[in-house]
């Protein structure tokens, strides 16, 4: 087979891989967003679901009155995403320590650390510097997008609206959206609590980069966790169900963008069986997003 034919096959394979990747990781979320918009935002399903948990006689959401439920599902639940972000920051800082020690490898401190557990941790941090910074940036962008949408749509929570004893009018987000300026004082769309759990999707992309065989299970667990976080707030009257879906969509898309910038599509699309041979994160460098050579290797 001549070189022109080989190159044509490589181009076809690369194009097919690219379409498959974006079809799954971008096309499916966009389709789901349209489905949520049509099913929830253009209908009264949100209110019908929320009505199930509202005591119209007492004028309250009974579960929302439980301090224990609030502590377990809202305050304590934030520990997992908060610790993940904090550990990423600590890891990113520590990733610069070992390279500094290597410059003074003849020092007493460097010799002591070389065979110690602390030295092992520092070398681990150096190897995964790119991953730590990815998690930090992914968390920052997804959180920033959620806060931007909250302030630029000014949607009030169910308990704050006249539908459930509050004083504010219930207005859908797309009727209130303002691109450049804050739309008002409402801060309920998308769901912030659910988004904190969905922010852990950054860990899925790290796992996918290393072709971890359980990455799909990790993805399912994170999505389930986000749904649980969001649903508990629905039970308390602080969110509609669609707010949780939108939070997941926004966080997924923003995290996907950061993952593409840090790792590149070809790294995120590698078959599981190539895990050991491909990724060696020894430096804080980004990989080209659509490397033809990488596509050809992963296809082979």
Where are the predicted features?
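Long, low-complexity, intrinsically disordered cytosolic termini of multi-pass membrane proteins
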Residues: 1, 275-300
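N-terminal transmembrane-helix/juxtamembrane module of multi-pass inner/ER membrane proteins
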Residues: 2-115, 153, 180
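Membrane-embedded catalytic cores of phosphoryl/pyrophosphoryl-handling enzymes
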Residues: 16-17, 23-24, 171-285
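Alpha-helical membrane-inserting segments
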Residues: 35, 39, 89, 93, ...
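Alpha-helical transmembrane segments in multi-pass membrane proteins
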Residues: 77, 134-138, 142, 146, ...
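Membrane-interfacial segments
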Residues: 97-109, 153-157, 161, 211, ...
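Interfacial segments of alpha-helical transmembrane regions
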Residues: 104-152, 215, 219
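Membrane-interface interhelical connector segments
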Residues: 154-182
């Amino acid at each position: 087979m001549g070189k022109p034919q080989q190159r044509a096959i490589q181009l076809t394979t690369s194009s097919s891989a690219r379409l498959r990747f974006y079809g799954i990781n971008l096309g499916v979320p966009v389709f789901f967003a349209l489905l949520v918009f049509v099913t929830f935002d253009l209908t009264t399903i949100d209110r019908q679901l929320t009505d199930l948990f509202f005591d119209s006689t007492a004028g309250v959401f009974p579960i929302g009155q439980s301090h224990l439920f609030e502590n377990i599902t809202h305050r304590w639940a934030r520990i997992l995403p908060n610790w993940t972000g904090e550990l990423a920051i600590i890891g990113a800082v520590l990733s610069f320590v070992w390279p500094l020690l290597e410059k003074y490898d003849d020092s007493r401190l460097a010799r002591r650390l070389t065979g110690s557990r602390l030295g092992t941790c520092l070398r681990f941090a150096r190897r995964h510097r790119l991953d730590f910074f990815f998690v930090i940036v992914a968390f920052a962008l997804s959180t920033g997008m959620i806060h931007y949408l909250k302030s630029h749509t000014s949607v009030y929570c169910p308990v704050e609206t006249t539908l459930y004893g509050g004083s504010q009018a219930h207005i859908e987000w797309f009727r209130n959206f303002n691109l450049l300026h804050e739309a008002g004082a409402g801060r309920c769309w998308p769901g912030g609590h659910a988004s904190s759990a969905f922010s852990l999707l950054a860990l899925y992309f790290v796992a996918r980069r290393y072709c971890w065989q359980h990455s799909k299970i990790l993805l399912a667990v994170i999505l389930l966790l986000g749904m649980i976080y969001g649903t508990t707030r629905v039970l308390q009257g602080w969110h509609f169900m669609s707010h949780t879906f939108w939070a997941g969509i926004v966080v997924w898309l923003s995290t996907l963008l950061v993952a593409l910038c840090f790792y590149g599509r070809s790294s995120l699309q590698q078959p599981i069986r190539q895990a050991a041979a491909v990724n060696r994160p020894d430096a804080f460098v980004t990989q080209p997003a659509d490397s033809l050579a990488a596509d050809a290797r992963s296809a082979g």
